[in-house]
């Protein structure tokens, strides 16, 4: 007999403002007619996402529609109610009602009874469970939740300066609600701890633990049985009434938990992200009272110190240069499973190995599960939203942010414990970040340390994602140093706005390629034209105006003035939206690639780089590698190119060509083919260099030096060939004899968020780039639910084909097919060159190819 059931209460919900409801929770949870005319909803959801789904408001992401939604609606509580059916047999079981996340407080009634009030459910990141065994019944059960919105000073969900604040503060039941039925003993907090033999990688010790709670009034004796593949282990347990006990299995008592030749979990480019399944069941008198399942990976995470200053990370003993970008959820927390899956695949497509979560994002475990499966490392922890008065709405401590009072310390420490227990089995999480811009107050950091010792000793933590160089006061006026753990060993010194390529290679004071830069980037990444037309009303598309600014960031990042000034200076002022689009994508590519490449080149003094940001919470102009509609910007393909495991790189600082090997093996008999072209596509220089690359290394293979006959704008073409002459990778640069000069003396005020340029490069000759004729053929092939496209390109002209942009369009709707996974894009072809480019996308609709480019006939 099996008594364990998990019932997800996701459908059949309705919501209504308490201002329109006179009945009490006891009435709402007994009389289904009260909510008959309320708005239909699902869970997880927020109040505003539900209103939008019911078309109460026009698309809040278009134009300035968001401004029309009154925040007063969300200053009162809102009701969520749902009914669910139980059989007579199910109603006789024990039951726990579990809330993974409610923002912010709640009173909960079930079948007329108050089972939890706002002192029990208090905080967006608290996870709560209630024994409702005596409250469930056969037939229809009604659950009513009064959700109380976050107030100024609450430790809620926030988006800092990335986008506008949601008018409802994301109030709602934003994570799953689960009814867990069991036979009296419940398995809670299952955990797998792995210890890898780092000398051989041929052995690993597995420790399995779980809490057993007896919810009955009688003593229960039974077996806790665990299974991992063919390995079975069990213990006989005797639980007194209402007792709770932590049960542990380890290899000392169960030799099967000493794994020989384990399949290790590795991040992308280092190996396969192998996973195992654990099944637990508690059996008493041949009846399964409860079960639990989880997935885990066998891996070892350690940190190390570079020159006693900079912190880095190792996975299974191998140093990993962290190459990542910062994630945000949808502004109304409306991410779908399909969207999350596409985004994780985009990360992999870009050759990134990490996502940073500033905030415990995710409506459920989907994001974390996918990162486990794809070998994407995760940095997970609190947001700086709680550290600054402008976001919290109340005064904060200059050094410690908003968490410094005893009652707040207890609240946040408990929320942290809940999140760690919720997520700790995900092998993709390699570090917990307990603060962002500041450090936790000593009492709070000690509570965090105690939580790690008790619940998760398997990975390091960071006391802050700021730290090294914090005396330079880029973010705030205080030094980011902990009294317990000292410096974090990582840095957060910007930049966050327009930054010239040379900066990343030459800067040794702020955000340049040394140490671990936990959030940085060259500023705005403008969406492609199709996306601009989706987010800005037609009449406001050109020239740029307030609607554009509304879709920028906040505060210092509320317009595009730095980006457009650089465009005007470097490329020439655009006279149309289409010209702006073309030049914006060129800048997206030009500015993003060198950031990642500089950290690749400087492997010996760099440990990590996180682009701020990866994605978009709503349609925006700033900080994104692909936009809200999942349309990659040119920065996406620049990142993809920069992070190739084997590549050639132009160093803007010393003007050398570097070869990069991200792999763990030696790469022998390689050849670099290096050519330089004028703006008229005349070859000015050519050389071939043979070399070998050590594992995980970079080295200079050629100094370009002073070349004769350069035009003001010129091109550098790099090809990496294997021992048979087959191309491994390519890279193409547009450079200027007028070198960009950084202005370190510029006065930017208290928040020195970037290093501007006082002299800009000159690419205006690109405006007269001679036209060329491009030939292409392509075909689509259906592969189950996926379509593949193969495109053969040939430059039939005598001039370089610059920034060829490939797009796939739905033939019926004319809309771009998204998401789409191109192996390369924004491609450059030499005269007479041919290249095959492939992509794949989901769907069966008839599609067609669009080919655009800077100088195509």
What role is predicted for each listed range?
Residues 258-292, 706-760, 842-857:
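Terminal connector regions
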Residues 354-555, 587, 591, 605-608, ...:
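Substrate-binding/catalytic cleft of secreted carbohydrate-active enzymes
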Residues 7-8, 14-23, 42-46, 102, ...:
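Substrate-binding clefts and catalytic carboxylate motifs of secreted carbohydrate-active enzymes
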Residues 281-347:
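N-terminal carbohydrate-binding accessory modules
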Residues 108-110, 202-241, 247, 655-694, ...:
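Beta-strand-rich binding/interaction modules
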Residues 137-140, 209-305:
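Extended acidic/polar, glycine-enriched regions
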Residues 183-216, 308-309, 638-671, 750-793:
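Surface beta-strand/loop "capping" patches
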Residues 5-7, 11-20, 46-54, 70-187, ...:
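Accessory beta-strand-rich segments of carbohydrate-active enzymes
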